[in-house]
């Protein structure tokens, strides 16, 4: 049985999931976290579903083996590829990023026209389209924006080139007159300014990061797994461990640019391997 003192495990294909980690830190400041960025194998978007599933479950096995009390799949592509497998495989609760964003989008839309942007793998999986199927009176337009992740992973989140790319990708959503747009990749909030500029102020952006953090809070509270208040004698100050399967120095530089000094001393993970 998991302990409330155990950490929350979070993973993504790279730095995008740090938007989820940041939201969890903001909403649950007392929690210990372990974050793994799979920069050695990501981005996941161009990979096949079996490849994504294998990489994601290898990291999940590692984190669960280290005793995390909950596992957060902070990656839309991985959520689409392996959520069912992960929930069958692990005894700890598994939180993903798709359904929380879908619920918020349905609650937000005024005209029922909702857009979704994501990696090619996420859009091809129809995970969002299927998740929206239960919502009545909604019209979903899904568009793949594969190059967004490459720009974010290189630290390029502004400039004419990225704005031009955004305008091209998002034009079908403007034609569809969506009033709510789901950022269906955890990298995309780092481009939210450009995306908002391209879509216009009348479109509401829904970030899966904030909604996922709320879901983590709900799940931990339901299972009495919230970390004790700092005044509790059992409690210790929160620890935040960041690891990368690729170059830890490159990960640190990029992550610190977005999240500041909270991300430092990133540890390399050499034992996360695919058989």
Curated annotation (Swiss-Prot):
Catalytic activity: L-glutamate = D-glutamate
Keyword annotations of the record: Cell shape, Cell wall biogenesis/degradation, Isomerase, Peptidoglycan synthesis
Coiled-coil annotated spans: none
Annotated PROSITE patterns: ASP_GLU_RACEMASE_1 (PS00923), ASP_GLU_RACEMASE_2 (PS00924)
Catalytic activity, EC: 5.1.1.3
Listed pathway(s): Cell wall biogenesis; peptidoglycan biosynthesis
SUPFAM superfamilies, A to Z: Aspartate/glutamate racemase
BP-aspect Gene Ontology terms: cell wall organization; peptidoglycan biosynthetic process; regulation of cell shape
InterPro entries named in the record: Asp/Glu/hydantoin_racemase, Asp/Glu_race, Asp/Glu_racemase_AS_1, Asp/Glu_racemase_AS_2, Glu_race
Any GO molecular function: glutamate racemase activity
Active site: 75 (proton donor/acceptor), 185 (proton donor/acceptor)
Function: Provides the (R)-glutamate required for cell wall biosynthesis.
Similarity field: Belongs to the aspartate/glutamate racemases family.
Alphabetical list of HAMAP family matching this protein: Glu_racemase (MF_00258)
Protein name per the record: Glutamate racemase
Organism, scientific name: Mycolicibacterium paratuberculosis (strain ATCC BAA-968 / K-10) (Mycobacterium paratuberculosis)
Top-level taxonomy: Bacteria, Bacillati, Actinomycetota, Actinomycetes, Mycobacteriales
């Amino acid at each position: 049985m998991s302990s409330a003192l155990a950490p929350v495990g979070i993973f993504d294909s790279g730095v995008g999931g740090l938007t989820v980690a940041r939201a969890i830190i903001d909403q649950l400041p007392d929690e210990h976290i372990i974050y793994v960025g799979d920069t050695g194998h990501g981005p996941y978007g161009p990979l096949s579903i079996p490849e994504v599933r294998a990489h994601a479950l290898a990291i999940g096995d590692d984190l669960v083996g280290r005793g995390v009390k909950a596992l957060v799949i902070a990656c839309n592509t991985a959520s689409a590829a392996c959520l069912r497998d992960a929930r069958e495989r692990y005894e700890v609760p598994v939180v993903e990023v798709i359904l929380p964003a879908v619920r918020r989008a349905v609650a937000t839309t005024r005209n029922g026209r909702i857009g979704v942007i994501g990696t090619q793998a996420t859009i091809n999986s129809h995970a969002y389209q299927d998740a929206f199927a239960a919502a009545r009176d909604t019209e979903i337009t899904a568009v793949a924006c594969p190059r967004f992740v490459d720009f974010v992973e290189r630290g390029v989140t502004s400039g004419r080139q990225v704005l031009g790319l955004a305008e091209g990708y998002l034009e079908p959503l403007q034609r569809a007159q969506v009033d709510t747009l789901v950022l269906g990749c955890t990298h995309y909030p780092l481009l939210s300014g450009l995306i908002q500029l391209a879509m216009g102020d009348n479109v509401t952006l829904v970030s899966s990061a904030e909604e996922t953090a709320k879901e983590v809070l709900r799940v931990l509270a339901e299972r009495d797994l919230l970390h004790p208040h700092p005044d509790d004698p059992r409690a210790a100050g929160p620890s935040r461990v960041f690891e990368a399967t690729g170059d830890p120095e490159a990960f640190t530089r990029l992550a610190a640019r977005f999240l500041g000094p909270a991300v430092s001393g990133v540890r390399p993970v050499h034992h996360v391997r695919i058989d």
